Amino acid sequence: MAFIAKSFYDLSAISLDGEKVDFNTFRGRAVLIENVASLUGTTTRDFTQLNELQCRFPRRLVVLGFPCNQFGHQENCQNEEILNSLKYVRPGSGYQPTFTLVQKCEVNGQNEHPVFAYLKDKLPYPYDDPFSLMTDPKLIIWSPVRRSDVAWNFEKFLIGPEGEPFRRYSRTFPTINIEPDIKRLLKVAI
């Protein structure tokens, strides 16, 4: 089991361009973390909605995408290929993320990234779908399997401006529909 940080602000990740992303710099801002994949059926919808949310709250929201290949091998690109895959394949049409993508990682199992160990400990299941895990157990390629595991690509975690994990959303919850919760956390008129 991965080490579980004491605070959200103790965590970090490495961006696709190799820079350390220190979560301590996010104090006072809401943070949306989503495990992503460039070859999933909802890639276009979710990536464009992540861009939209980042553009709507440019100074008060941090969006972080964590590419992961644990679900249907739908992120089989190497780190250096991910941006080109997004630009030319899916979503395509010159798409460029306006948010930070970090290096590919595992979100479940023995080698899960510390960010996901922390978030799953604090938010053990999506509020909108607390009962689903994997639809097909043959697709589980990690061990150990836990009830709190991320079930598929594009699960989302929203963290408040004080660093408290607020809510976890399932893969079926449209990313753009998180906006009212972001406004609530940021105390913006809805």
UniProtKB/Swiss-Prot annotation:
Catalytic reaction(s) noted: 2 glutathione + H2O2 = glutathione disulfide + 2 H2O; a hydroperoxy polyunsaturated fatty acid + 2 glutathione = a hydroxy polyunsaturated fatty acid + glutathione disulfide + H2O; tert-butyl hydroperoxide + 2 glutathione = tert-butanol + glutathione disulfide + H2O; cumene hydroperoxide + 2 glutathione = 2-phenylpropan-2-ol + glutathione disulfide + H2O
Any GO BP: response to oxidative stress
Keyword terms, alphabetized: Cytoplasm, Oxidoreductase, Peroxidase, Selenocysteine
InterPro entries linked: Glutathione_peroxidase, GPX_AS, GPX_CS, Thioredoxin-like_sf
Catalytic residues in the record: 40
One example GO MF annotation: phospholipid-hydroperoxide glutathione peroxidase activity
Pfam family, one: GSHPx
Transmembrane spans: none
An annotated GO cellular component: cytosol
Protein name, per record: Glutathione peroxidase 2
Organism expressing this protein natively: Pongo pygmaeus
